[in-house]
């Protein structure tokens, strides 16, 4: 498997240890991958999912990195990569009847978003 290295016109941002299931975050990232920054923000604002808050925060950070570090215009940016990887689970216990305890796993994930300058081809 080959991995693509970020190019000179790509800026990245990572959100680590975000509370939420990786599958629930991925269903939102699948919707915004490949879209422009403006379209993605509008979509995230009106989606009814709890994970849109942290995703919006990471997306804004990636765009700020592109503006500050690379001098790119936010209007010309597209979301080139958007991934969610599994983080560690926090283990908690729920007391149950007759002295039993049920395990509860509170899942976390790592969100990575890369934005690139839009090419006119």
Swiss-Prot record:
Cell membrane found in the keyword field: no
Assigned keywords, A-Z: Ribonucleoprotein, Ribosomal protein, RNA-binding, rRNA-binding
SUPFAM superfamilies in alphabetical order: Ribosomal protein L22
PROSITE patterns registered for this protein in UniProt: RIBOSOMAL_L22
One function term, GO molecular function aspect: structural constituent of ribosome
Entry function: This protein binds specifically to 23S rRNA; its binding is stimulated by other ribosomal proteins, e.g. L4, L17, and L20. It is important during the early stages of 50S assembly. It makes multiple contacts with different domains of the 23S rRNA in the assembled 50S subunit and ribosome. The globular domain of the protein is located near the polypeptide exit tunnel on the outside of the subunit, while an extended beta-hairpin is found that lines the wall of the exit tunnel in the center of the 70S ribosome.
Protein name: Large ribosomal subunit protein uL22
């Amino acid at each position: 498997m080959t991995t693509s290295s970020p190019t000179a016109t790509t800026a990245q941002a990572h959100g680590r240890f975000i509370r939420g299931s990786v599958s629930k975050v991925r269903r939102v990232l699948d919707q915004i991958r490949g879209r422009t920054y403006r379209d993605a923000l509008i979509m995230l604002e009106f989606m009814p999912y709890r994970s849109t808050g942290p995703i919006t925060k990471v997306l804004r950070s990636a765009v700020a990195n592109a503006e500050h570090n690379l001098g790119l215009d936010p209007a010309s940016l597209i979301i080139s990569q958007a991934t969610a990887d599994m983080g560690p689970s926090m283990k908690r216990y729920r007391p149950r009847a007759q002295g039993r305890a049920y395990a509860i796993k509170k899942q976390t994930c790592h969100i990575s978003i890369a934005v690139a300058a839009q090419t006119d081809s």
